[in-house]
Amino acid sequence: MSFEIKLPTIEDRIKEIEQEIKKTKYNKATESHIGLLKAKMARLQLEAESHKKSGGGSGFSVPKTGDATVALVGYPNVGKSSLVNAMTHSGSEVGNFAFTTLRVIPGILKYKGCQIQILDLPGIIENASSGSGRGREVLAIVRNADLVLLVTDNEAKGMDKIIEELRKVGIVLNRKRKNISMKRANTGGIRIRKPKSLTLPEEQIKAIAKEFKITNAELYIRESVDSDDLIDFFRGNVVYLPSMIAVNKIDLPHDETKIRELNSFGKIAEVSASTGKGVEELKEMIYESLSLVRVFLRDKSGKIDYERPLVLTEGTTVRDVCRNISREMLVSFKYAILRSDRSKVNDMRVGLEYSVADGDIITIVSRN
């Protein structure tokens, strides 16, 4: 008699680690152990991802349009389609049952002179990151967004699980990329250059690195980090996105305490797509979260184009403004005349490296 030995799959091993993390109470004594478990899980997720990519398959394809893209992420039947319709009038199909949206439906929110693409995505379910319910295809769309709008309903359930599904595919919300770099070596082990203030033990840093098959390297850590930051760095395919939460169906009975608990995941907008309550406030919060910068162009005659501002992002300079208009303007640039609420001087001469802000009015003066 022969017995077939079934080896655990990568997904099986990931689930085992997830269960162990859930069972382990987090404290100072277990912090290092949990960090290593997370590192092992992240490495296995990378392996699973590479296997799935090599297998091919069709996915969703959505061209980016407008000045920024917002992806709506949430469980089925929380009212994402209704919310998109309330903001954009896109005609996304609505129903009182799960999985009404089976494809990505884009709409355009026109707000304060900006055109913001809103993506109504199919609802994700538990284990979406492993492929359940076409989850990996949905989550791949999210990676290219400028803002993630997490949508829940009056029951306010499962937000932590949704955020975890996003993290599993390398989407990290409301965190900044840490200043870490690495130079690989052939010998010498792992040498760490870090600030004195860093409390993460060197042994733990080295153990996490070794989980990602790094045994010889110079690792430069230039600010305070935790094990999650290190794992994200070694993983290498992580995107960092801002996010906020929309609690839909707020016109129905709900528990305010549960909704307040969502504050730990980001800013909250309480809305009702069916009655319109809070929809305008949600639009403003989306606009603010995107950190868009509208620059109004003024020609030599003094006419200002308030209808079609140039929409850029925070940190934009006069150089970026010129580059977005035309390369030729950048070459022939002499100076710019800026009118801004920030300055007491109404028409101030500025150069290419001057930072512009939302609402600034600018005239570009060329050499010829």
Descriptions of predicted regions:
Residues 23, 29-68, 73, 78, ...:
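C-terminal-of-GTPase-core extension/linker across diverse P-loop GTPases
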Residues 2-186, 192-200:
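Conserved G1/Walker A P-loop phosphate-binding module
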